[in-house]
Each structure stands twice: as C-alpha cells, then as structure tokens.
Amino acid sequence: MFSSIARAIIGTSNDRALKAYRRRIAEINGHEAALATLDDAALQGKTSEFRDRLAAGESLDRLLPEAFAVCREAAKRVLGMRHFDVQLIGGMVLHDGKIAEMKTGEGKTLVATLPVYLNALSGKGVHVVTVNDYLAKRDAGWMGQLYNFLGLSVGVIVPGLEDDARRDAYAADITYGTNNEFGFDYLRDNMKYALADMVQRDFNYAIVDEVDSILIDEARTPLIISGPSDEPTELYNQVDGIVKQLVEDPDTYDKDEKFKTVNLTELGSERVEQMLSEAGLLTEGNLYDVFNVSLVHHTNQSLRAHTLFTRDVDYIVKDGQVIIIDEFTGRMMEGRRYSDGLHQALEAKEHVTVERENQTLASITFQNYFRLYPKLSGMTGTAMTEADEFDEIYKLAVVEIPTNVPVARKDGDDEVYRSADEKYEAVAALIEECRQRQQPVLVGTTSIEKSEIISNLLNSRKIPHAVLNARFHEQEAAIVAEAGAPGAVTIATNMAGRGTDIKLGGNLEMRLKTELERLPESARPAREAEIRAEIEAAHDIVHAAGGLFVIGTERHESRRVDNQLRGRSGRQGDPGASRFFLSLEDDLMRIFGSDRMGPMLEKLGLKDGEAIIHPWINKALEKAQKKVEARNFDTRKNLLKYDDVMNNQRKEVYAQRREFMRAESVADVIGEMRADTIAQMVERRIPEKAYAEQWESAELAEDVKRVFGLELPVVDWAAEEGIDESHLRERISEAVEAHMAAKAANFGPDFMRFLEKSILLQTLDHLWKEHLLALDHLRQGIGLRAYGQRDPLNEYKAEAFALFTAMLEDLKEQVSSVLAHVELGSDPATAPAPAFDPASMFTSHPASGPYDGVALAEPQPTLAPEMAVSTYRAESVDPNRPETWASTPRNAACPCGSGKKYKYCHGRVT
C-alpha cells in the first residue's frame, strides 16, 4: 500500500528516467529547422565535422543532440521516415547502455539508427546483433542506405562468408550479424596462428535486437566449435533397444516433469543390468562399477531421450535428421545438436543414422560473450518481467518506452476449461465468429503437435487457414505478410523473434515485391496502383472488424512469451483483441499450478463444456509463471557462477595466446619454460633438505632422457662429493641449453623463431581442449559433494584451479620436450606454417546446459608435415610397483589401470 502511494507521489524509477530523457528532446528538436535548410552535401559533411570534434576531445554525449538531429533529417530524405519523439528517447536509452522496451510496431529498427550513427563516429565499430540471417541482411540493406548517405560503411556477417569478406565486414563502421556468427567468429579467431588471420577487431559497442531472446532464453546454451571424434556409434542403437523395452514399465524410472529429470528406480537398475548382460554388453561387475561408466552414460541418455523428449514438441525428424525445435520461437534449430550423446540417443530412438559425437575445441556462452563488450545495449518488446536478471547478470537497466499512440488492444481475461478438447472446441467457435465479421485471427500454440491438433479441427470445419511452425519454416515471411488480411486465420507455434510485423489489411511492401517482379516493366505502374487500393480497402475492413484477434491456446512458462504473442495485435494504435484459452490438462496448470486449483475451480462453478472466467485465475496463473521464472533465473545464475570459473581461465588463455602471436620471438618464454621444467624435475626427484641417499638420481636421469632426449651422467654427478640440487640443476640446464643452441644453429634463427611459436601455440590449443573436457567431467559430478556437506561451487573453483595449474605445468614440459625432439626431414625454408582448418570443424549451439560433456578423442599436437618428432617412453614404470609410477608421462594412461590419465589419477596435483 505504502509503495503504491509513494509511486503515485514521486513516480517510478522508469518515470524519472523518462523525465530526464524528455528534457533532451527539446534540444534535439531545436536543430531540426536549421538542418532542414542544408543541401545533401552540407548534411553529409556533418559526419566529418563530428569526427573532427571527437578527435579534438569532445565527448559522444556532447555530440548527441546534434548527431541525433542529423540522423533524423537524413532518415527523412533517404528512407522517407521521421523519428518520433519517443523514438528519440529509445535512441538515448540505447546510447546510455541500457535496454529499451518498445512495443511491437514502434519502429525498433529505425530507433537503432540513432545510437548506431552516433557511436560509429568514433571509428571503433558498432555491432548490431539480430536473431536470424534474414533480419541481418534486411536491416543492413534497408538502414545501410541511411548510413551510406551519411558517409559510414556497413558490413553484414552471414554464414558461408570467407575470412577476407568477414574481415572487411568487421572493418566497416557498422556490422550487422546474428549472435551465433559474432560468437563463432570470436572462437575461431582464438584458434588461429597469426594476428593477420583474425577477422574481428577489438570490441566497442553492441546493440542486441530481441535482447531477451538472446541474453535470457539462449543464455544457458554455449556456442561450441568441435572436431570429429573417433567414438563408435553402434552402442547407441544397442542400448536404445534395451531402454525402449524398459520404459514400457513406468515403475522402472522416476520422472520429475517440473525439473525435467529422470532416474532409474532400484527395479529399473536391476532390469537394465539383466538386459545388458543378456545382450553381452555388461560382461563383468555391476552396472555402476567404474569400468562400466560408458554403459551408464549411454543408458541415462537413452532414458532421457525416451521419457523427457517428445517428437514434434522438442524436435522433429526431417530428411532423416533429428532437428531441435526452439521452445521459445518454434523455429527449427538446424545445425544445432544436443551435446553429451543425447542427440545420438534421439537418433537411435527415431531409427535414423546415428552421427558420431564431436569433441569440443572451443566454447563460450552468450552470457560471457556479450559481457566482453565495453558498452552493451538492447531492445525488445518484452523486457520488464526480466529486469532483475538483466540488472544482476549484465548490469543493464531496463527502460519502458511509451508508445507513440496509446495501445487500443483489448485484452480479455483467461477462459479455463476442464479438458483440452473442450478448450479447442471453444477456440474453433471463436475463430468462426471472427471470420464471419472478416476479423483476422492469430492462434498461438506452444508446440507443433498442438498447432496440428487445431489445424485438423479447423479442416474438419472447413475453415481455411495457414500454419506457421517449424515444418513450414520456408513459407514464414509469406504467411506472416498475409496474417492481417480480412478473415485470415493463422496458426503459429510461438511468435517470439519472428521479426515481421502483422499489418492490418496485409503487407503492402511484400505484395508489391512478390507480384511486380513477375510483371513486365510496362505493366507494373497500373498493377501497383491496384495493389495499393486493395490493401487500403482491406485495411478499412479489418479496422472496422476490430483489428487482429490474438488467441493463446496455452500459457507459456514465461510471461514474456505470452506478452510477445499479445503484442502482435494493436501495433501503432491499431485496434485489436487478445484472449487466452486454458484447460486443467495444460502443462503449466498440471505441473506448476497449485494442487488446489482444480477443487477451487469446481467451487467457482466449473462444469463440463463450460468456461470459468475469473480474475483470481489470472492471478493464480501469474503466480505460477513467476515461480517458474524465478526457478529458471536461479538456474541461469547458478550456471553462470560455474561458467565464470571457466570464463576467467578462457580469458587468461586467449590473452596469453594473443601475446604469443603478437611477439616477434617467444624464445624468452620458451627458455623460462625449459628452466621451470628442469627445476620441477629436480625438485620432484631431489626434495629440499633430503639426504643424498634419498635422492632418486637414476629416475632423474630417466626424466631428462624422456623429456629432452639426452642421456646425461646424472647418477655420476649426484655421487660427487659436495654437490647439491642447485649444482645438478645448473649442469642439466647447461647440457639442455647447449643441445637447443646446436639445434637452433642447424635450423637457422628465422625458422627457429617460427618453430618455437607454432609449437607453443599448437601445444597450448591441444592442452586447452583437454582442459575443457576435464572441466566438463568435473562439473558433471561436483553436485554430489553436497552430500558430504561441502559447497559444490567452492569445490569446483578449487579443483578447476588445480587443473588449470596442472595444464600450465604440462604446457611447459610438452613444449620443452617437443622442441628438444623435433627433427627436420627437408629444407627448413619449405616447411609450411601451422594451418587453421575450419573445414574439419563444426559449429553448434546445443540446446542443453553448457557443462554437458562431450567425449573427446586424444590427438597429439599437429606439427608441420616435414617435422618428425622422436619420442622416448620411460621403461622403468612397473604397474605392480607404485613407487615407479612417478616416471609416467602426465598425459599417459595411469599404470593403476583406472583408464584415467596419470595427471588426473595418481599424478594429480594436490
């Protein structure tokens, strides 16, 4: 009560922000009259003037009023559009590094031109991030006319571009592209071997369109670059046949729909063990013995595929492939795959070809990618419901921009029915009623399956309609363009991120484009006049009928997605209406609704075939949605804490990598690595203050031979009177440095510099890839530490740091060893530089958590073909004598027989 009184007196924080922005509008408008008198050349000259003023020390904030006014004047001349005052506010919000919430149809694309123009004046580049390639190309071409008029260059990043074209696009003042393309280019750049090969420049400023979709809905899933693995795929089909039989009995597993988890019961474990044994897959021990970990993994993923994932809801099968469906947009996510073997389990379930798993080479989440920009802003029609998350994770404030014309849409209360069939009948009846008065209808569904239920129902009633879901992705633009025509009925699987407005009467631009290009030039003017008249007449009919009627057939988990659907109606002051039809069988009502909802509705008078309309229901549903949103926020926040550990290590590795590439020579770094490696060897075999008889001098000689390929009289040196560990270290160092100096003299200084740098970079890449896998495995099991009363996050941080430290120690030893062993089989001048090979890699954005591991293979660092490395393996390791295991190379299998690498087992850093 008191908070509402306070808001009424002093206003909300949003009101106060708008008040401050409105004060600047008068200043911007004050330039309009003078700029209107300038000819085109004088107006275009303003860009050079602004750049000179920036170079002289003036700030972008000081330039803002005049720069915005220049951009508006240019838009009037080039695009025939003038920014409204509320659009100026939106532009200022974006320039200030905030999120502008603007309703559908309020001209977000035009709003973005203001801060884009202003920030591009610095020459440091502006990235405009869209949700799909169509919008990136459309907006770059459309708004590019304005930027080119003002003397700014525009680039666009789309799939399939060669590196030279990408580099040119990033070098432009303004670059349009999708979130995926920007992120993948960042990862690819950090896998290259020369700065000149990179395509991106330093980050400056990004504006993210549909910011809620990219930074919230897709925040949990990482971008991954991977290479092919040698793992066989037959086991997926074998396990699938067993699990398919198992799940016929619901007592064999426990499923939690709320948290989307499934586990075998005790009965299920016994049954699956028996079936695996009968199939010859489980040959010794029980299912949960350490050497059967692969079987457990395959069984769990197959169980998830059969019980948690539904065809035509979570994925579709098209052209022999399992294609994921985005739960927020209903789009096919072609090219994306679930990670950690889940996609292979789905392929086995659907009897299509099981593709090999891929091994992760590099990955990053959108949360961490977009936090790399010094300045970030975004725009969307629905952000206020997630304002807390934007603020806490991205430090982005949300400002709700008022509409230019008040919203005239009428939002009806939800209608609740007992069963889904009753609900669909009511939806069909309302559609028929709307068609009789020629009112267009947009029906929103949450899955392909449900859109086809409604489509079949309308077909039985002979009601013509269009279906917009992942199956008909190609016809999307044409379907949306006609969705506002008189009497049109369109069924859509979620309208989030569709990017195309539904205009009352039909889309004039789309019709002109599609119809006129088929006609000869002479016939076009007459047909254009006819189309314009038809669209105008249709607009009047639809306007009189009440505008677009949006029908929601189910509440989504997120209020934001419901608001996006509603927002398709009532754009720019048009009339419209919306209503949601629900049933007690809907997922949200069934899983998250209160157990008391059913009995309460009966008390309110809910009967078969009738609907209940009551404000209490709306409040109860909103409460359920808030509960789900809070849970999802906590999940994302928790995942970010874990990902931040990897992110800090990633930033360190990538920064170090760039330092190596930037350096003329890395000889000093390599020299320090050799010195550290020798010091570690000596320290391990001759601990400080140890007696001479405790020295492991023979083992030290073995280490030197294994790492550096040198047979030194270490045992004899150690037997000398008065020698200590520092003298031993110096003698070994002198011998190793003499060996390396002779090698450098043989190779020549130029080639030695090239060799040192390429081996250093390739070894770092190889170890980083291994480290990513180790972190994945660590993350998967770390939650169990909670049972031991230990904080999993703190445990993860400590162990991840130990793994990172071990990786850096491995780097020193491996680089030193490879350089010591490398020999040339031909003239050094002909040896090629290490190559970055994108053709052998895959980009993916899997629809699962960023820590779902992928089984990685174990390739060695790739050297140039003419370099032959002679390796040495210590022969003194005896699996039956643990005291000899210390000579085991850190990346070799542990002699204990666990199957793990030595460095993760008995050689683990503690």
From Swiss-Prot:
ATP binds at residues 87, 105-109, 501. InterPro entries: Helicase_ATP-bd (IPR014001), Helicase_C-like (IPR001650), P-loop_NTPase (IPR027417), SEC_C_motif (IPR004027), SecA (IPR000185), SecA_CS (IPR020937), SecA_DEAD (IPR011115), SecA_motor_DEAD (IPR014018). It is found in: Cell inner membrane; Cytoplasm. The keyword Metal-binding applies. Its main location: membrane. May bind 1 zinc ion per subunit. One of its GO terms (cellular component) is cell envelope Sec protein transport complex. It catalyses: ATP + H2O + cellular proteinSide 1 = ADP + phosphate + cellular proteinSide 2. GO terms for molecular function: ATP binding; metal ion binding; protein-exporting ATPase activity. Its EC number is 7.4.2.8. Its cofactor is Zn(2+). The keyword Zinc applies. Zn(2+) binds at residues 894, 896, 905-906. It is a peripheral membrane protein. SMART domains: SecA_DEAD, SecA_PP_bind. Transmembrane segments: none annotated. GO terms for biological process: intracellular protein transmembrane transport; protein import; protein targeting; protein transport by the Sec complex. Keywords: ATP-binding, Cell inner membrane, Cell membrane, Cytoplasm, Membrane, Metal-binding, Nucleotide-binding, Protein transport, Translocase, Translocation, Transport, Zinc. Monomer and homodimer. Part of the essential Sec protein translocation apparatus which comprises SecA, SecYEG and auxiliary proteins SecDF-YajC and YidC. PANTHER family: CHLOROPLAST PROTEIN-TRANSPORTING ATPASE (PTHR30612:SF0), SECA INNER MEMBRANE COMPONENT OF SEC PROTEIN SECRETION SYSTEM (PTHR30612). Belongs to the SecA family. This is Protein translocase subunit SecA. It comes from Acidiphilium cryptum (strain JF-5).
